[in-house]
C-alpha cells in the first residue's frame, strides 16, 4: 500500500475488531464421527458492484466440522446464476478430488464418492449432462471437466434447499440468525475451556 487512506485504516480496524471478537471460536472435531467428506458449494450472482463478477464459496466437512473452505471471486463474469453456480461447483469438484487424494494418502483407503450439495437444480443437471447445448456453450471449457468426474463417479452433486446451504455464509452477508446457524453447522463453536486471558 503506497498511499494508505482513511478508508484503509477503517477496514484495518474492522478486521482487528473481528479478530478480537472471534478469538474464542474453534473448530469442534468429535471422535467417532468417521471419515465422510461432504461439500457445500454456492455462488452469488454478479455480487461485485464494480465488475459484476460473482463470488464462489465452498466448504468441505470431515465428520463434525469443516476441514477445508474457500471464498473467492470468479475470474469471469457469469451470464446467469446457473453459470455462476456451475463455475463454483467446478471449483468445489477440484477441491473434492484433491481432498480425496490427500485423505487416501493419510488413511490408505479410498473414500466413497464425494457428495457436493448445491442449491441450483439447473446447475446439477448441467453437471450430469455430457451433451453441449445452447445453454452451456458460453461457459468456459475449463469448467466442463466436472462432467467427466461426475460420469466416473468421483463426485456427485445433490440438491439442498437454500435455507440449508452452508456455503451461503462464504458468498454474501447474511442476517445474524442465519450466520449463527451456518457457523454452528460448520462446527465452529465457542471454546469454553479457555478464557481470553489464557490465550
PLM-predicted stretches and their roles:
Residues 1-3, 35-37, 45-49, 68, ...:
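Flexible loop/turn segments at secondary-structure boundaries
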Residues 8, 20, 53, 92-95, ...:
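Active-site-proximal structural scaffolding
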Residues 1-26, 161, 169-171:
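C-terminal reverse transcriptase regions that engage the nucleic-acid substrate
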Residues 40-82:
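RNase H-like nuclease fold core
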Residues 4-8, 32-33, 52, 80-85:
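Secondary-structure capping and boundary motifs in well-ordered enzyme cores
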Residues 36, 72-199:
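RNase H-like nuclease module associated with reverse transcription
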Residues 17-41, 108-110:
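Structured nucleic-acid-interacting core domains from mobile-element enzymes and related host factors
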Residues 21-25, 46, 66-68, 102-105:
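Conserved helix-loop functional segments at active or binding sites
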Amino acid at each position: 500500500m503506497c498511499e494508505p487512506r482513511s478508508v484503509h485504516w477503517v477496514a484495518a480496524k474492522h478486521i482487528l475488531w473481528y479478530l478480537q471478537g472471534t478469538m474464542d471460536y474453534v473448530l469442534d472435531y468429535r471422535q467417532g464421527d468417521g471419515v465422510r467428506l461432504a461439500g457445500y458449494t454456492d455462488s452469488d450472482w454478479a455480487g461485485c458492484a464494480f465488475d459484476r463478477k460473482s463470488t464462489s464459496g465452498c466448504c468441505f466437512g470431515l465428520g463434525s466440522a469443516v476441514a477445508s473452505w474457500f471464498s473467492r471471486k470468479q475470474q469471469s463474469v457469469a451470464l446467469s446464476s446457473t453459470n455462476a453456480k456451475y463455475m463454483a461447483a467446478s471449483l468445489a469438484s477440484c477441491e473434492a478430488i484433491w481432498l480425496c487424494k490427500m485423505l487416501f494418502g493419510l488413511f490408505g483407503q479410498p473414500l466413497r464418492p464425494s457428495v457436493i450439495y448445491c442449491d441450483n437444480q439447473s446447475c446439477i443437471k448441467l453437471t450430469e449432462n455430457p451433451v453441449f447445448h445452447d445453454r452451456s456453450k458460453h461457459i468456459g471449457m475449463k469448467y466442463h471437466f466436472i462432467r467427466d468426474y461426475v460420469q466416473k463417479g468421483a463426485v456427485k452433486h445433490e440438491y439442498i434447499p437454500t435455507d440449508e446451504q452452508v456455503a451461503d455464509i462464504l458468498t454474501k452477508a447474511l442476517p445474524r440468525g442465519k450466520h449463527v446457524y451456518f457457523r454452528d453447522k460448520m462446527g465452529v463453536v465457542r471454546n469454553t475451556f479457555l478464557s481470553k486471558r489464557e490465550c
